[in-house]
């Protein structure tokens, strides 16, 4: 990485556990990266894994002041690296989805009048009506989610109208009525980021707004009925003022950078601020993702993303407007129990293994056991498959409380059997393959209506599987991804996979400011994107016999989920 004399663009990624700032040049070369890890780098916040928790009510939230501290630190780090801020032409960002920030009536004045001699943390806390932001792992809103479902008649109808299902504003105005009354504007985490750089409360992004359950996707406007439910006594017009208008162009210039940053860091006064999007929409912008390509983000959560022209909402999935391209949608599956659940199994294997754990690779025992276990955990070709659900936190898909379930499944029309049992299981050894398979089987089950055959005689599946996030470094997990999900062209890793959100945000800024009239993101970025530099094939994809075995496993997995759900309701 080195300096560049041409225009530069910054993409920020404000995720659950860290803030990253990534700088690219016009030709998409990464020239600087800075990051701030909340657990190890923040001072004065009693957090764990980036959040505070109230276990009694299932609340998970983050102190907004910590994010301000992180932004101060990341900008200072970029300065120390030698970034010439005067060359930065545009800024965009990515924010963890479903989190909200509450501004008070002094916010505009404070944002617009920051003192260049002081930090953001010292000045902006006074602009908030509530000091915390709910996190996507929060499970305190089940009552509110159920009300949203019932309000439009069913969860299927809510999914059809809004692209997904459920939100925190309804709970916030009930639990903190005084803070809600003092709230003049509400931001998502993404628009909060943009607001700081803009020096004014920024509008929502056309894609990220779809995660609020208030945006009518077929009509592309606020849904008046859902606003009424969410607004409480103050009424829908008051809530609409707090939410603001939403520009439909994901590349629109919102304005120039706040004078605070020009004074403190020597940004050029003409540096443009563009809409910041959600972390998941930003991830699909980290490469020109084509329809039928799938991206799997293996981070704290497990997330499956596809770009598709088809709008086929379902209560267990999320659809969003594409962050840059009208006429395309982003399909998303998001699971709370991703990396944290895999880590629990890893730790159990390390604790019981006779092998010494390599401190430089704590996954070595897990990977070895995973690869030694045959697909489906079948000891013999005709033996039962081992299946499980591993939820250390309450899960969204399926909607279940925390717990762990183990099943044996024998496929076949004549002798099919599904049985909840630990018979034949060796814990935690068998859990390694079972947990990885369970996460990928759920993805295959829920994406099957959106994939089709990539070539004659080949069963429906993605064309390519791209892995991003921390788990993308794990070759054993990548191998199982290809076995379960297919991918006729194989499984690939983005070589900056852990920086995918920040990279997508930076690309979005490049496109917003350098596009020709009507030029799409896919066209501009596709012309500059060098696949051989950014992508590495790390595993085989479609293998006919194993893919067929997992087709049978999907049937058992679906039945297992239904049985556990039915028992949970009793």
From Swiss-Prot:
Broad class of the protein's primary localization: cytoplasm
Similarity annotation: Belongs to the FGGY kinase family.
GO biological process, one term: D-xylose metabolic process
Subcellular location: Cytoplasm
Positions that bind substrate: 98, 279-280
Residues that coordinate or bind ATP: 363, 470-471, 474
Catalysed reactions, as listed in the record: D-xylulose + ATP = D-xylulose 5-phosphate + ADP + H(+)
Up-regulation conditions: By D-xylose, L-arabinose or L-arabitol.
Catalytic activity, EC: 2.7.1.17
Molecular-function annotations in GO: ATP binding; D-xylulokinase activity
Species of origin: Arthroderma otae (strain ATCC MYA-4605 / CBS 113480)
CDD domains xref list: ASKHA_NBD_FGGY_SpXK-like
Keyword match ATP-binding: yes
Gene that this polypeptide is encoded by: xkiA
Name of protein: Probable D-xylulose kinase A
A Pfam family this chain is assigned to: FGGY_C
Cellular component aspect of the GO annotation: cytosol
InterPro entries: ATPase_NBD (IPR043129), D-XK_euk (IPR042024), FGGY_C (IPR018485)
Record keywords, A-Z: ATP-binding, Carbohydrate metabolism, Cytoplasm, Kinase, Nucleotide-binding, Transferase, Xylose metabolism
């Amino acid at each position: 990485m080195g300096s560049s004399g041409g225009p530069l663009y910054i993409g920020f990624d404000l995720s659950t556990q860290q803030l990253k700032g990534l700088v690219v040049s016009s030709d998409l070369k990464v020239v600087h990266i800075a990051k701030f890890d909340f657990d190890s780098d923040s001072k004065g916040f009693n957090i764990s894994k980036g959040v505070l928790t109230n276990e009694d009510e299932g609340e998970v939230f983050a102190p907004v002041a910590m994010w301000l501290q992180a932004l101060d630190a990341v900008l200072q780090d970029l300065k120390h690296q030698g970034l010439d801020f005067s060359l930065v032409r545009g800024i965009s960002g990515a924010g963890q989805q479903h989190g909200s920030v509450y501004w008070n009536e002094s916010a505009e004045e404070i944002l617009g009048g920051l003192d260049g001699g002081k930090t953001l943390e010292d000045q902006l806390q006074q602009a908030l009506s509530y000091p915390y932001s709910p996190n996507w792992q929060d499970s305190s809103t089940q009552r509110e989610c159920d009300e949203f479902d019932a309000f439009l008649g069913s969860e299927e109808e809510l999914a059809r109208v809004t692209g997904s299902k459920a939100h925190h504003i309804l709970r916030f105005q009930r639990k903190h009525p005084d803070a809600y009354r003092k709230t003049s504007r509400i931001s998502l985490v993404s628009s909060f980021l943009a607001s700081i750089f803009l020096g004014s409360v920024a509008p929502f992004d056309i894609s990220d707004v779809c995660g609020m359950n208030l945006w009518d996707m077929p009509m592309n406007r606020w849904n008046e009925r859902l606003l009424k439910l969410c607004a409480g006594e103050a009424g829908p017009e008051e809530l609409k003022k707090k939410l603001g208008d939403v520009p439909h162009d994901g590349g629109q210039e919102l304005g120039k950078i706040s004078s605070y940053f020009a004074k403190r860091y020597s940004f050029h006064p003409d540096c443009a601020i563009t809409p910041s999007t959600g972390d998941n929409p930003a991830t699909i912008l980290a490469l020109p993702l084509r329809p039928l390509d799938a991206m799997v983000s293996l981070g704290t959560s497990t997330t499956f993303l596809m770009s598709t022209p088809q709008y086929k909402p379902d209560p267990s999935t999320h659809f969003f407007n594409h962050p840059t391209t009208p006429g395309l949608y982003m399909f998303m599956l998001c699971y709370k129990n991703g990396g944290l659940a895999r880590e629990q199994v890893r730790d159990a294997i390390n604790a019981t293994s006779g092998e010494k754990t390599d401190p430089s690779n704590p996954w070595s025992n897990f990977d070895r056991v995973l690869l030694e276990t045959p697909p489906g955990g079948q000891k013999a070709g005709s033996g039962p498959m081992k299946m499980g659900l591993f939820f250390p936190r309450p899960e969204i898909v399926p909607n279940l409380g925390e717990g762990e379930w183990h099943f044996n499944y024998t496929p076949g029309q004549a002798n099919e059997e599904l049985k909840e049992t630990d018979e034949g299981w060796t814990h935690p050894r068998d859990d390694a393959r079972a947990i990885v398979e369970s996460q990928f089987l759920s993805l295959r089950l829920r994406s099957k209506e959106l994939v089709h055959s990539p070539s004659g005689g080949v069963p429906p599946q993605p064309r390519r599987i791209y892995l991003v996030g921390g788990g993308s470094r794990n070759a054993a997990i990548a191998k199982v991804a290809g076995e379960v999900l297919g991918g006729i062209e194989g499984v690939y890793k983005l070589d900056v996979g852990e920086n995918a959100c920040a990279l997508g945000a930076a690309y979005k800024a490049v496109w917003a400011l350098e596009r020709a009239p009507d030029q799409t993101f896919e066209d501009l970025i596709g012309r500059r994107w060098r696949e051989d530099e950014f992508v590495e094939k790390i595993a085989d994809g479609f293998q006919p016999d194993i893919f067929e075995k997992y087709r049978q496993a999907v049937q058992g997995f679906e039945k297992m989920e239904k049985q556990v759900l039915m028992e949970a309701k009793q």
